[in-house]
């Protein structure tokens, strides 16, 4: 009769709260559907086209980050409804997400249109630092180049 054998595998399934904010980003963009106003946590196994459907700019940004992030990549995603839903602006979306997640940086997937948008990102960063004592950087997206108007 043979003796039994026990094998123990210590797997990191990335479950539970994110304890280290390094390299964990929040992607914010406008979209539609039932995911608006909900914080999504995505990783390399997530179905991004299903989770972020209807937010093409955001989907492109998150997909590029995932493809460049390596096997243990993860991020948070927040959609807002620019046409007047419960979370109606990127600023509101960031406020909602900060209540639920700790991140190193915030990536705005929709193009910025003016200098006041950049100033608003700086002001939001300072408010987050004042309220949560979390240093957070922001990355905005420049508008697409238009040869006719340039």
How would you describe each model-predicted region?
Residues 1-150:
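Surface-exposed assembly/interface segments
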């Amino acid at each position: 009769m043979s003796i039994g054998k026990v094998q123990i595998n210590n797997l990191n399934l990335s479950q539970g709260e994110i304890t280290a904010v390094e390299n964990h980003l929040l992607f914010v963009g406008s979209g539609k559907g039932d995911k608006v106003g909900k914080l999504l946590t995505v990783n390399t196994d997530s179905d991004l086209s299903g989770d972020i459907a209807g937010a093409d700019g955001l989907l492109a940004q998150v997909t590029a980050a995932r493809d460049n992030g390596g096997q243990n990549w993860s991020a948070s995603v927040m959609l807002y409804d620019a046409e007047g839903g419960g979370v109606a602006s990127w600023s509101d979306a960031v406020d909602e997400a900060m209540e639920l997640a700790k991140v190193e940086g915030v990536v705005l997937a929709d193009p910025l249109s003016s200098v006041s948008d950049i100033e608003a990102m700086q002001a939001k960063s300072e408010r987050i630092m004042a309220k949560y004592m979390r240093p957070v950087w922001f990355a905005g997206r420049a508008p697409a180049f238009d040869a006719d108007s340039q």
